[in-house]
């Protein structure tokens, strides 16, 4: 019984190796090999892809040559911590003053119960 099963496993392994070799014959020999583009193909690609055709190295060089963009206004006056806290507390108190005393919160709670 061992003879036919060993023979079947060997045949399947050989078939697997041959199929892998057959499929890899169409693959390029070297991955680092660059394609020799004709000038006409270069123009086509540049038109089809726009600025995305520019190589990554030249794009990185352009970004490195540019000065970093200013993100802050140079004349910005920063608030101190007590000033920021006072401004925050004033903004919290402001809506309570605008509400007045005529707002009934029980109506809001009743409406919420119906939508559960």
From Swiss-Prot:
Widely expressed; predominantly expressed in epithelial cells in the skin, respiratory, digestive, urinary and reproductive systems, retina, adrenal gland and various brain regions. In the adrenal gland, expressed in parenchymal cells of the cortex and in ganglionic cells and intermingled cortical cells of the medulla. Expressed in the type I glomic cells within the carotid body (at protein level). Widely expressed. Strongly expressed in esophagus, liver, pancreas, kidney, brain, hypothalamus, thyroid and ovary. InterPro entries: Spexin. Keywords: Amidation, Cleavage on pair of basic residues, Cytoplasmic vesicle, Hormone, Secreted, Signal. Residues 1-26 form the signal peptide. It holds the Pfam family Spexin. One of its GO terms (cellular component) is extracellular space. The record marks 35-36, 52-53, 72-73 as: Cleavage. This is Spexin. The modification Glutamine amide is found at residue 49. Residues 27-35, 50-116, 74-116 form a propeptide. Its main location: secreted. The lineage of its organism: Eukaryota, Metazoa, Chordata, Craniata, Vertebrata.
């Amino acid at each position: 019984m061992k003879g036919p099963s060993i023979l079947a496993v060997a045949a399947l392994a050989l078939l697997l190796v041959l199929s892998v070799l057959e499929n890899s014959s169409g693959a390029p020999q070297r991955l680092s090999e660059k394609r020799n583009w004709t000038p006409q193909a270069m123009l086509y690609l540049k038109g089809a892809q726009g600025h995305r055709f520019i190589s990554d190295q030249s794009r990185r060089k352009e970004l490195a040559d540019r000065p970093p963009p200013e993100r802050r206004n140079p004349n910005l006056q920063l608030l101190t911590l007590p000033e920021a806290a006072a401004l925050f507390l004033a903004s919290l108190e402001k809506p309570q003053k605008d509400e007045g005393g005529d707002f009934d919160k029980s109506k809001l709670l009743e409406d919420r119960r119906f939508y559960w």
